[in-house]
Amino acid sequence: MHAATEQLVRIPVDTGLIEGALEWPPESQGLVLFAHGSGSSRHSPRNNHVARVLRERGLATLLVDLLTPEEDRVYATRFDIPLLTQRLLDVTDWARRQPATALLPMGYFGASTGAAAALSAAASQGAGIRAVVSRGGRPDLAPARDLARVQCPTLLLVGACDEEVLALNRCAVAHMPGPTHLTIVPGATHLFEEPGTLEAVARLAADWFAQHLPTRGAPSGAQ
């Protein structure tokens, strides 16, 4: 297997630049954009583990900090779902302009609060986003009107021991009209720190994206 190509990127937003890591294996079959939870970053070991498994399955990945360093120092900003949603949309637009990713079908992987931003962004993108996976997500933080507009296949992964978040996800399923599946990971708490649980998340996410991201092209390089 050939190694993935890695590129550190800087993406312009309204208040400056945000940074990310774009990696694509040869003949990538799709691109997954990651939205991490509050207090985390693109260096999140959990998201990077999932991203590595996705690349092994032939998918390109883009892990990005949706806030500038200055914004991230303000605690309340980490929970500003409209801002995080707009940033994810900015990243999506940027990815569609890059030769490495322009032709690839796209999906979102959101963790915790990042899942709310991923769902809201998917709602506004319509058919432009082909699939969403949420890990321990907080769909309750997304506006109800956005949940009602999510049409793409969505996989909600929640730990069996994460009782509060599990209840929130069960409620969200009832408000989402698109194909939505809630999978409970046995023995897992919110951070999926228990042996084998994060591996299960990565496998389930890879299977979901492989099923729902149709082949449309292969990358040639990024700017």
Predicted region positions:
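Catalytic active-site module of serine/aspartate enzymes centered on a nucleophile-bearing elbow/loop
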Residues: A188, G196-Q223
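A conserved short beta-strand
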Residues: A127-P139
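Gly/Ala-rich beta-loop-alpha elbow adjacent to hydrolase catalytic centers
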Residues: F109-A118
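Catalytic histidine neighborhood in serine/cysteine hydrolases
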Residues: M176-L191
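Serine-hydrolase catalytic machinery in alpha/beta-hydrolase-like enzymes
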Residues: L8-L104, L191-G196, A200-V201
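Conserved alpha/beta-hydrolase "acid-adjacent" motif
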Residues: E163-L168
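Short beta-strand immediately N-terminal to the catalytic nucleophile in serine-hydrolase-like folds
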Residues: G107-G110, R135
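Short beta-strand/loop motif that positions the catalytic acidic residue
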Residues: V150, L156-V158
